[in-house]
Amino acid sequence: MRGQGRKESLSDSRDLDGSYDQLTGHPPGPSKKALKQRFLKLLPCCGPQALPSVSETLAAPASLRPHRPRPLDPDSVEDEFELSTVCHRPEGLEQLQEQTKFTRRELQVLYRGFKNECPSGIVNEENFKQIYSQFFPQGDSSNYATFLFNAFDTNHDGSVSFEDFVAGLSVILRGTIDDRLNWAFNLYDLNKDGCITKEEMLDIMKSIYDMMGKYTYPALREEAPREHVESFFQKMDRNKDGVVTIEEFIESCQQDENIMRSMQLFDNVI
């Protein structure tokens, strides 16, 4: 999506630093808030602890409230030092609004959470896996985190910037059904050759079972992931050529009510 030159030619991120409040300015309802926190816990650099509610922020003593940084002055020696410690600063807020389906306020909140976990402005695979593992202590999330990292790292340069992160998040949360299914296909297509093999699907499925841990599904047998994949792959590989194309993947998912319901769960996450 962006080359190395983009990560070296950086613009001022002051607009993204302008808010620590919740996305709408009001705390969400219980069910929406719970779903939002559950989803954000699955993503790096954007854990729910980075997004306090407005009521929590205002109720806290002044000394404990999140500090809202003043706008950076490029001519200030102090600000110049602060900026020099950041490896990557995202492009302008207006440009990110054009490229994603997030509002200005939403981008500010997402950037605050990202920067809290990734002060350098980018995250590599090892850091990504470390952050992700905090939310699945009962299992081994390392393999799934690697697959997810590669899906966010669209230009395959070994790092995920804030732009990479919000681009993927925008598709997952605000994209059309086809957009989301295309993103999911890319996640499963591990070698990025344009089709999904049974082995790739099995690798993903095993990583999910490993991540959830044996304590979550104690009754599952070791062969359960393979049986799951065999059943699912037979439905998707419509011409029985041993691979699933993007067309077969989308068509099969659109005809599965459970998958369609799961896609719609993300419509109002943020």
UniProtKB/Swiss-Prot annotation:
Q: Where is this region: Disordered?
A: 1-34
Q: Name one GO molecular function term.
A: calcium ion binding
| Assembly and binders | Component of heteromultimeric potassium channels. Identified in potassium channel complexes containing KCND1, KCND2, KCND3, KCNIP1, KCNIP2, KCNIP3, KCNIP4, DPP6 and DPP10. The KCND2-KCNIP2 channel complex contains four KCND2 and four KCNIP2 subunits. Interacts with KCND2. Probably part of a complex consisting of KCNIP1, KCNIP2 isoform 3 and KCND2. At least isoform 2 and isoform 3 can self-associate to form homodimers and homotetramers. Isoform 3 interacts with KCNIP1 in a calcium-dependent manner.
Instruction: Identify the keywords attached in UniProt to this record, alphabetized.
Output: Calcium, Cell membrane, Ion channel, Ion transport, Lipoprotein, Membrane, Metal-binding, Palmitate, Phosphoprotein, Potassium, Potassium channel, Potassium transport, Repeat, Transport, Voltage-gated channel
Q: Where is the lipid attached (S-palmitoyl cysteine)?
A: C45, C46
Give the residues annotated as coiled coil. none
Entries under Pfam families matching the protein: EF-hand_7, EF-hand_8
GO cellular component terms, alphabetically, are: Kv4.2-KChIP2 channel complex; plasma membrane; voltage-gated potassium channel complex
Q: Which InterPro entries match?
A: EF-hand-dom_pair, EF_Hand_1_Ca_BS, EF_hand_dom, Recoverin
* Name used for this protein in its record: A-type potassium channel modulatory protein KCNIP2
Q: Where does Ca(2+) 2 bind?
A: D189, N191, D193, C195, E200
Q: Where does Ca(2+) 3 bind?
A: D237, N239, D241, E248
Q: How is it modified after translation?
A: Palmitoylated. Palmitoylation enhances association with the plasma membrane.
Belongs to which family? Belongs to the recoverin family.
Q: Per UniProt, where does Ca(2+) 1 bind?
A: D153, N155, D157, S159, D164
- Do the record's keywords include Transport? yes
- Region Interaction with KCND2: start and end of each range? 257-270
Q: Compositional bias of type Basic and acidic residues: which residue ranges?
A: 1-17
The highest taxon in the source lineage is: Eukaryota
| Effect of gene knockout | Mice appear healthy and show no signs of cardiac dysmorphogenesis, contractile dysfunction, hypertrophy, or heart failure but are highly susceptible to the induction of polymorphic ventricular tachycardia, including arrhythmia. Myocytes show a complete and selective loss of I(To) current in the heart. This is due to the loss of KCND2 protein in the heart ventricles.
One of the GO biological process terms: action potential
